[in-house]
Amino acid sequence: MLNITKNDLTKIKEPLRYTGGEYGEVIKNESEIQIRVALCYPNLYDIGMNNYTTMYLYSLLNSKKGIYAERFFMPDLDIEKLLINNNQNLFSLETKKEMNCFDFAIFVLHDEIEYINVACMLKLSKINNKDSKGPIIIGMIDNFEFKHCNLDNIFDIFVYGNKSVIYNDILFRYGVYKSQKLSISDYLYSINSIENVVVPCIDSNKKIEIENKLQRKIQDEKIFPMIPVSNISSINQRLNIKYNSNILKLYQDIIKLIKNTGITNLNFIDVTNDYTSMLMLIKNLKKSYPFLKITIQNLLFSQDALEIYTYTGMISSNINFEIFSKSIKRKELDYIMESIELAIKNGAKKIHLKVNIGCIDETYHDLEKLSCFINKIKEKVSIYSTVKFSVKFCYEVGCNIENIELKEKFLKEKLNNISFSFEDINLVKLRSILKTPNVNIPALIDKAVNSGIRVYNENLDLDLLKLKKLFMELEM
């Protein structure tokens, strides 16, 4: 029984994050449900509702007879305290059931830094994966550079790439397992035989077939027919759609989806260099829905992509360029400069140059060359446009934090009155540690959760003082 009242919710910020009831939410009759799935995103509702994999799985699983997927998100600090004070476990948005009531808990693993939130959500649900009475815990991984071994003590199953495997193989076999009353070990051995599915208690070092699975993933994934649309006015919820070359079918599917959901913000991902077809699709969508906002994720700015930028209005938003200090080539620098000038000439008001420094074999000569280039950009474009500079540290195993700090200081001194936002060194260090296979990671995650360290949004807003103190305690 839920111990949180409406009066309790009035005391927290954004209570609609926890109430559910959105347009497009799926509710099923209890008599129809054979397998319950807790679909978990280890960050705030605001972030998870814009995650492609989460929305895809929600639509896929709930379109299947006998399966019911309900959403769980990382609670903000205010309601986390409320849950603890009321002795209330984390609950789903749809039916307010606790995670222990589900057969499966699927966590969408998007960023290593969110490992901490995964552990926190399980703690708030009073779930220990060693307890046979709890749900089977699955990690859904899209990034093939992801190293699951640091989470082997938490997860029962990892799935790489092909999301349809969740239903076609894992849940289908579970239905057979339940009906025939087979042992859980027999079930897990069966699952481990599936390509790109890892059961760590059986074979954590199983080879992942990256290339074949990536190709199949694009073929298998179709546009989803139903998603919840957020009730929170401050959330500019967008619909993430995988682009494909069959633009007529894609157009028809998108139009149907807009009619069903009322969503007005589209974001295309996995876009190819077929700019002509992409532009045709965008023009037809805008003709049908003039107020539709369309963006293309990670679309590199160039002469070929210019018309898409101007037609969608993306030209007036941040135009991003990225550069790595290591082994910068003159041809690359000239191309970036020409692209920046082209963007400004066509109305760009905001340029964002993300600078990556800190590679293990990087030299100060690399940084010198980089700083000269940045100063040149500032001289050319500052009159016409706002240029935002940010530094991301490429912390690698073997790097010395003190050396990176010295490089940061060197870069600041070389840049003439240019304002930079620098990534926090402790955050960079944490991300690198979590990426590196290490038997001590579970202890670090547990310590971080107990220390009150949380990741509350996509900008990685966490208590860096607590993080620094944690490193000192663990002598890291």
Where do the PLM segments sit?
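Radical SAM enzyme core and accessory elements
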Residues: 1-25, 39, 407-476
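Short connector loops at secondary-structure junctions
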Residues: 66-86, 142-145
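Conserved SAM/AdoMet-binding glycine-rich loop
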Residues: 39-43, 250-352, 357-365, 369-372, ...
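N-terminal [4Fe-4S]-dependent radical SAM core
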Residues: 6-38, 45-46, 197-241
